[in-house]
Amino acid sequence: MNMAQLQLKQSAYIKKVNGTGSLRHHLLDMGLTKGTEVTLQKIAPMGDPIQIEVRGYELTLRLAEAALIEIENIHQRQLVDKVEPVRYEPVPHPGMGELGQAESYEAHAKAPVLPKGKKITFALAGNQNCGKTTLFNQLTGANQHVGNFPGVTVDRKDGTIRNHPEAVVTDLPGIYSLSPYSSEEIVTREFLLQEKPTGIINIVDASNLERNLCLTMQLMELNIPMVLALNMMDEVRSNGGSIRINMLEKMLGIPVVPISAAKNEGIDELVSHAIHVARYGEVPTRIDFCPDNEGQGESLGAVHRCIHAVAHMVEMEANNADLPVRFCATKLIEKDAPIEKQLDLPAEKQEAFEHLVSILETETGLDREEAIADMRFNFIESLCKKTVVHPHESKEHKRSVQIDRLLTGKYTAIPCFLAIMAVVFLMTFNLLGAWLSDLMEIGVDGVINLIDAGLTAWQINPVVHAMVVEGVCNGIGSVISFLPTIVTLFLFLSIMEDSGYMARVAFVMDKLLRKIGLSGRSFVPMLIGFGCSVPAIMSTRTLSSERDRKMTILLTPFMSCSAKLPIYTLLIAAFFPRGYQAVVMLGLYLLGIICAIGYALILQETVFKGEPVPFVMELPNYRIPSAKSVVRLIWDKAKGFVQKAFTIIFVASVLIWFLENFDIRLNLAASTEDSMLALLGSVVAPIFSPLGFGDWRISTALITGFAAKESVVSTLTVLLGGNADQVNNLFTPFTAMIFLIFTLLYTPCVAAISTIRNEMGGRGAAVAVVVIQCAIAWCIAFLVYQLGTLAGLA
């Protein structure tokens, strides 16, 4: 029997994990090893994927992946209320630098003591969703985005530790192992192996050590000074649990520091320990996790013997490749292709290695990958029994279960999602955002009038006066007025992500996205795309399949980004009754989604044939969004928007004003029609004539929109003499709608195109995106225009 055949709330023990390649290895690294108990907790509303509980955490996977896992001993797990546990906290933490054990640590120092002031580099590594980015912000004072979705960090970020100018810490993407399953794991592994930081700060979720310590054991094999940060200790204590810090430290052989990154508890102590082990080169005192001498079975002894034999055999090749010997030995046994390639063992050693592995598999009754995973999790289980007093079911988990009954329920999940998105759109475009934008517009107009009056009083040159007021002020002001709308949208997106709801959306929508060749994890980058395409495209790095990643990147520009909101708001307010404005706005977003689906179906049958990536994802508990995190994100987005307004849009506004007011001989133009801008616009205008808006001013605005979508509004404002309300002289309600459709679908901005070039690895891909998006936009707009003309709307 396999896991896909389990009934709701049934439990079973894993008998065997079938399959091949990186997926199977990833499942083993997630703790799905032989003999592990699993419970089917939930089935997605559409029947697939499923959510299981394993080793104290929630994991989602599709029925296709679940069918690879053989199970036995099906039963109903007895849920017994836990009594109040005995707390083991006689000493919160041992002495500085483990002074009580300093002799044993310093005996393992691998390098001379670094002088004070010498640069120290740290790698901040940990599982996804363990509070890593929060800790990075506490260490450095940086403002990285903190979310409650697996994979918030999609690139390495560097920062200097506060009060320690010599210490630099790098926030690496969250990973579950050092095996190359996803691009984020590759980024982390390459940094650790190639750049060789002075030390590692390994952050783990203290409420689920069993899952987190698998990565810890692999990091310890790198032979780099390391400290373990036990995060979320406040939650462990509040739920009635505790951890024997001293015992944990003794069994692991590395310093262990209890912290709460969210509450800034224990951070100073963590920094002191990290700098101490890095300066003194104190590497982990234990890298053997095979307790063959502790009465725990001959099979573990077989793993122990195999690892040591392989390590001895490949020592020369590992040293030549500048790689840790123990790490190479375990990775070779796990069939790690990059390590195999780097070591390039000679034929006689390869033959001896295969012989050692065959002995291992015979003695353990497991294949080589299972044997290593089994060794790790046996050690982790033994360690947790001795050091962890398990708490009651956490308040966070209870709350999550109750909320999920509604938000991921069979009949309520999709209605709830639609209702939530409807509220977001209503608040952003009709109520809160629109009201704040009106207030902002009044303020901006007041500032422009003051500047105008001041320049008049000072009798400034009329040309300069016109450039400042009509060019700069009106151009920038027209965009700044929409800042509240954009901030409101990011506020709601941030709350959805920080709370953990986006992970549930991925779970609910997976089966739907699979029909267009993607997985549920692709839904989150596309949802982020409604805010900004750049972070959305970068967040595709959390996808383990190159096919899915590239396909998601190509679909993300169809999700209307917030930079287009000023265009929509301007035209919708000018041409549509207030009661229908939210409907028109929603219709534009839905059209973008429909076009993305159509494009995905074409890509699935042509360029990206094949199956979508397996959907294996941890579901975090719901958390109340941190007000500090939300405010930080909003501030960053507002600051970025204003910076763009005073850089790109400033330059664009001045340039547009200059081209509009001077002719080709650089004389003041007698009229706008004689200007250089009219000449340039008239060259492009015929392309848009079949769409119903052949005016050169419109084509000019679309061209400037390539630099930044907000520039479309600022350009139109400048060309209309500083009065955007005159836009009804350029459009009818019907042609305004065609223009909106075109701006919805045409090329993303330069920043997004640059990101696409970086992520897809070439200029050709970026050029192709520009051409294809413009072609799709033109064809859809042309089709709608022709249909509307036939219907008499023109």
Question: What are the roles of these predicted feature ranges?
Answer:
Residues 95-177:
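Conserved G1/Walker A P-loop phosphate-binding module
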Residues 164, 187-256, 567, 574:
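Conserved C-terminal guanine-recognition region of P-loop GTPase G domains, centered on the G4
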Residues 227, 237-392:
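Alpha-helical transmembrane helix bundles of large polytopic membrane transport and channel proteins
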Residues 363, 370-374, 390, 431-472, ...:
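Extended, low-charge hydrophobic alpha-helical regions
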Residues 407-507:
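Core alpha-helical transmembrane segments of integral membrane proteins
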Residues 416-427, 489-494, 572-575, 589-602, ...:
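Hydrophobic core segments of alpha-helical transmembrane domains in multi-pass membrane transport
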Residues 442, 446-450, 503-533, 609-633, ...:
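Juxtamembrane inter-helical linkers in multi-pass membrane proteins
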Residues 562-586, 751-762, 783-794:
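Transmembrane helix-loop junctions at the membrane interface of multipass transporters and ion channels
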